[in-house]
């Protein structure tokens, strides 16, 4: 398959049984680190929401959410969440969280339009987190500070796993490198955005790529972002170099959330100003929700990275094209 990478001479250092134990080890340690360093409280989260609420993540604006009707409620439609980006900010207010406090949760989603490969699945599992900040903290200094805390959690987890498993060596650099999408475009003008991410990740080991969603000087955005959660001038992806596949691997997407001005501007740029009338978006415009920063951290990608797996299907159960399943089996890649 054209999207499948088969590493030379790959074989997993862990069998299926030990992989399951290792997955739990990674997840337990990392989420405890995240809660500790970002001062987060674990909460329960919805699997589905009312599409009329505006709480579902619109992602890049083209992905179709999974929806179903509810018999008892006269055929009312519910949508399976694509992420909890909007819901978390709403929950911080509803649950009464104050400045400096935050929440995290397990988020499970179905992305039916995903093109699957070694790192993409139609099943998405991530830690979604959000915390309250002040208006004056809506700046890049705040973003960088939180990114460093998240990166510290990643570094601590890698060190912990290297102690638990002899075959795992520490490969993350001591510090993460910060760069904007425009700076990347200037450094690598002849490359695609994904190629730029690969080159900077391979050169630096770990990169925080900032300002994603708006058009660059070349007239094209680095990548798509929903207009109604991240402020496109105050967001980022954490991308690390992954030698098993020789790729830049995105582990986290995060950002300072939109205020009224950023929301209205981005809705207009995205060609969907009518979304300003949805309940969630209207609550931002009316100043009813707290200022926040938040993000998502891929659980399966974290496990894949720290366990040095070749395919995300080695650490999560999903459905894959038959050709992919067959080719993986022929190269000692055991999909769950």
Can you describe what each PLM-predicted range is?
Residues 34-41, 150-161, 310:
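A generic secondary-structure signal for well-formed alpha-helical elements
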Residues 21-25, 29, 138-145, 149, ...:
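Generic recognition of stable, solvent-exposed alpha-helical segments in well-folded globular domains
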Residues 105-191, 195:
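Extended, charged alpha-beta segments that form solvent-exposed binding/catalytic grooves
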Residues 47-51, 166-172, 321-325:
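A glycine-rich phosphate-binding loop feature that marks nucleotide/adenosyl-phosphate handling sites
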Residues 110, 180-336:
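A translation/RNA-centric and nucleic-acid-associated enzymatic feature enriched
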Residues 68-71, 93-99, 119-121, 169, ...:
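A general structural signal for short secondary-structure junctions and capping/turn motifs
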């Amino acid at each position: 398959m054209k999207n499948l990478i088969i590493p030379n001479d790959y074989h997993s250092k862990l069998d299926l049984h030990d992989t399951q134990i290792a997955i739990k080890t990674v997840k337990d340690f990392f989420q405890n680190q995240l809660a500790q360093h970002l001062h987060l409280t674990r909460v329960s989260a919805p699997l589905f929401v009312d599409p009329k609420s505006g709480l579902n993540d619109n992602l890049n604006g083209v992905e179709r959410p999974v929806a179903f009707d509810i018999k008892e409620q006269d055929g009312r439609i519910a949508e399976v969440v694509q992420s909890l980006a909007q819901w978390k900010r709403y929950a911080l207010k509803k649950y009464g969280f104050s400045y400096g406090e935050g929440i995290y949760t397990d988020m499970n989603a179905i992305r039916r339009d995903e093109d699957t490969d070694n790192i993409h699945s139609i099943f998405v599992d991530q830690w979604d987190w959000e915390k309250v900040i002040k208006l004056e903290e809506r700046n890049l200094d705040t973003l960088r500070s939180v990114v460093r805390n998240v990166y510290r959690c990643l570094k601590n987890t890698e060190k912990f796993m290297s102690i638990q498993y002899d075959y795992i060596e520490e490969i993350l650099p001591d510090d993460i490198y910060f760069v904007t999408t425009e700076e990347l475009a200037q450094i690598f003008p002849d490359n695609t955005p994904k190629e730029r991410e690969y080159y900077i990740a391979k050169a630096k080991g770990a990169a925080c790529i900032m300002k994603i969603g708006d058009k660059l000087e070349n007239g094209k955005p680095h990548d798509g972002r929903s207009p109604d959660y991240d402020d496109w001038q105050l967001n980022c992806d954490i991308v690390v170099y992954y030698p098993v596949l020789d790729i830049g691997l995105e582990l986290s997407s995060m950002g300072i959330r939109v205020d009224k001005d950023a929301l209205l501007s981005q809705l207009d740029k995205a060609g969907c100003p009518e979304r300003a009338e949805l309940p969630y978006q209207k609550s931002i415009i009316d100043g009813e929700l707290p200022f926040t920063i938040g993000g998502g951290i891929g659980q399966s990608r974290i496990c894949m990275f720290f366990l040095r797996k070749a395919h995300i299907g080695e650490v999560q159960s999903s459905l894959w094209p038959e050709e992919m399943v067959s080719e993986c089996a022929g190269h000692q890649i055991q999909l769950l």
